């Protein structure tokens, strides 16, 4: 019989994609999500094939009410979206710490064997190496800047998870997503935000870019991301950390031009000051996950077309 898997944050953008993939793989899945950022409609096509529990991971009683055996936990529940880093730093840290501790307590009580922790590229701040591998030093440049609540919470989660895993789990793995994009991801992220703003742009109106436009990112389509997660889920090694992304770099201004071209628009830019704490460049080293058989197939241009179609 296929293993029973609990996915926290399973109705979110990434969580729902992983949930659908595991259901297709004949796994028995429980989704635990309060739908504050997630959406039940993302799971509509498989709702009769999963068990959905609406709840907040900070509600320990609700979390521990999950019945029966759980073999594996995939922990994704968090608050994502850059604007929330600045607006809700306390809530982000509360979920990162108290929410995770509740999930780990459930693992201990149910004797869960395997745990996959979703971390983030936000743990890499001002990295020494580009592309950045998993051995890069993790740091918080400014504890007063609310932006780092997200990356700081992820670093705390990694520390808790690693040492809990050594004591209680058969397998503990961290995966660090890098700028995942795709249809229905929410408008708080750069690609859907740009698409929506382009559609509303009036003739001769300048397109606003935060920062210089020279900031560099590497994007991975959700379908390629799920393939990467699948490689980690099936072949990843205990106590290892894996980047999931591509090392194809693009500046934010070139990204805007690419989206405009796909939409058939001509644009002129208006640039403004960069948000404090926003990294100038982010690009993962993916040699480690490639050794598990990972290969990304969707170009950024084709990925944007998939969103629009």
Regions found by a protein language model. Name each.
Residues 1-180:
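N-terminal Rossmann-like NAD(P)+-binding domain of SDR-like oxidoreductases, especially those catalyzing
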Residues 14, 62, 92, 153, ...:
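Hydrophobic alpha-helical packing elements
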Residues 18-21, 55-58, 200-309:
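C-terminal substrate-binding subdomain of Rossmann-fold SDR/epimerase-dehydratase oxidoreductases
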Residues 107, 165, 198, 232-233:
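Hydrophobic pocket-lining residues that define ligand/cofactor binding sites across diverse proteins
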Residues 156, 160, 164, 193-194, ...:
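Hydrophobic alpha-helix immediately C-terminal to the catalytic Tyr-X-X-X-Lys motif of short-chain
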């Amino acid at each position: 019989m296929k293993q029973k898997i609990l996915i926290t944050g399973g109705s979110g953008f990434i969580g729902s994609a992983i949930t659908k993939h595991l259901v297709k793989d004949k796994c028995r899945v429980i989704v635990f999500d309060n739908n504050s950022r997630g959406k039940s409609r993302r799971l509509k096509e498989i709702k009769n094939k999963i068990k959905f529990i609406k709840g907040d991971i900070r509600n320990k009683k609700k979390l521990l009410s999950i019945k029966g055996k759980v073999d594996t936990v995939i922990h994704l529940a968090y608050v994502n979206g850059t604007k929330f880093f600045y607006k809700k730093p306390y809530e982000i840290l509360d979920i990162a710490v108290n929410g995770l501790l509740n999930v780990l307590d459930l693992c201990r009580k149910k004797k869960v064997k395997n745990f996959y922790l979703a971390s983030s590229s936000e743990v890499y701040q001002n990295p020494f190496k580009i592309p950045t591998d998993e051995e890069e030093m993790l740091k918080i440049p400014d504890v007063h800047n609310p932006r780092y609540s997200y990356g700081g919470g992820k670093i705390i989660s990694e520390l808790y998870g690693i040492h809990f895993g050594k004591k209680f789990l058969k397998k503990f793995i961290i995966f660090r997503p890098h700028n995942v994009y795709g249809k229905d991801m929410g408008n708080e992220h750069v690609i859907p935000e740009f698409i929506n703003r382009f559609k509303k742009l009036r003739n001769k109106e300048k397109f606003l870019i935060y920062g210089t436009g020279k900031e560099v990112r590497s994007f991975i389509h959700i379908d390629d991301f799920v393939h990467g997660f699948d490689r980690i889920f099936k072949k990843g090694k205990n106590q290892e950390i894996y980047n999931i992304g591509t090392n194809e770099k693009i500046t934010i201004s070139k990204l805007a031009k690419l989206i405009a071209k796909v939409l058939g628009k001509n644009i002129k830019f208006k640039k403004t000051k960069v948000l404090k704490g926003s990294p100038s460049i982010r690009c993962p080293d993916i040699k480690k996950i490639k050794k598990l058989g990972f290969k990304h197939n969707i170009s950024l241009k084709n990925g944007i077309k998939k969103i629009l179609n």
